[in-house]
Amino acid sequence: MDKTMISGARALEFLGQFDFIREAGTEGELAAAEKIRKYLEQNVSGPGITFREEPFSFEESRILEARLVVTEPYQKEYSVVGCAGCGSTPENGLEAPFLYVENGDEISLAYARGKIVLVNGIVRKAFYQKLVEAGAAGFVMLSGTPIDEGEDLRPARRSLRGVEETPIQGVTVHYKDAVELVERGASRVRLILRQEKEKRISRNLILRIDGSQRADEILTVSAHYDSVPEGPGAYDNMAGAVIVMELCRYFSVHRPRRTMEFLWFGAEEKGLYGSLNYVERHGEELASHRFNMNVDLAGQTIGGTVIGVTGNPEICQILSAYAHEAGMGVSLKHQIWGSDSNSFAWKGVPAMTLNRDGFGMHTRHDTAALISVWSLERSSRLLAMVAERLASAEVFPFPREVPEKFREELNAFFE
């Protein structure tokens, strides 16, 4: 492998152009897509190299009003953010007894019927259904920490996904306000939540390099380029996007034996919408796909590198051997992963996600200031070596299969 072709400094310089919020379906995400397109046009070209954009639409909930007011034994309104996707309360809201149910254990939920409940965790599909079955009238999540100050006191935006029937509504309150609600003995509250659904447009960016000999076998290298609305998402996941760009540049010069597609997915943070659109749109072609190499969370100096593999267990052994040969520390995990690699594995294509521990994910602190040349270059070289070995192998080294255990978990994940 020609290591001189991989530059962490170049990757960081490009990443610095994206120090803005890129929420899916907004002008920020569109601006990022345009920057990526222009960079590819200027730096990656040649015979057998093609670029395309694939727009897609998705539905998003827009919060119109969210309020939480204590009515007994004191009166006070708290700052909250509405939970997107859980429907709306009646116009005048819902007033009910208030109860702290901690982690939603069986004993605490035995008292939840008819009450608006405060919970410690994020209410996702399974927890939501648990609250509905317990007869809760509504829910309040908490976010943040007891040491937050200033703008960090704003509650986080949360979304409920994959639920068709939404009989109860909820909001998020900051940790410090949650403490006050419990310690002051709030016993009755009014919850108001109004939201409406709107259609948004995102897009996937795809650069294809035709294979020189085994063009009918396809490898993909992917990362999402959107961010959450709370921050500019340098670590999550513009760093991953620029790593894919480095590999794209590398293989445009060192042409692969197998066809490679470099994918920048939109709307990952909204529910893997970009990668799901890709695997649905290219369903027939997926039979030719051998492996997806995804990057999600990268670039910070302090942390550990992890590769999560969703496929045959021998893939872990092969990737471990590659890492040993390169002398790069990495931990291998054999499981499904909460990123775009799941979309491929769900459709039967073995997949991996390269991931690095870090700080500030989904917050305003996730900025380019925390990203390092050293980390970007190291992760780029590791992934490039893996991709080059797989792209150039005379016979592909592992089967195109996803174990039944993972298929069941993925069906539940996407249900």
Question: Which role does the model predict for each range below?
Answer:
Residues 229, 265-359, 364:
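Metal-dependent peptidase/peptidase-like ectodomains
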Residues 80-100, 104-106, 155-234, 246-249, ...:
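Soluble metallo-hydrolase cores and metallopeptidase-like ectodomains found primarily
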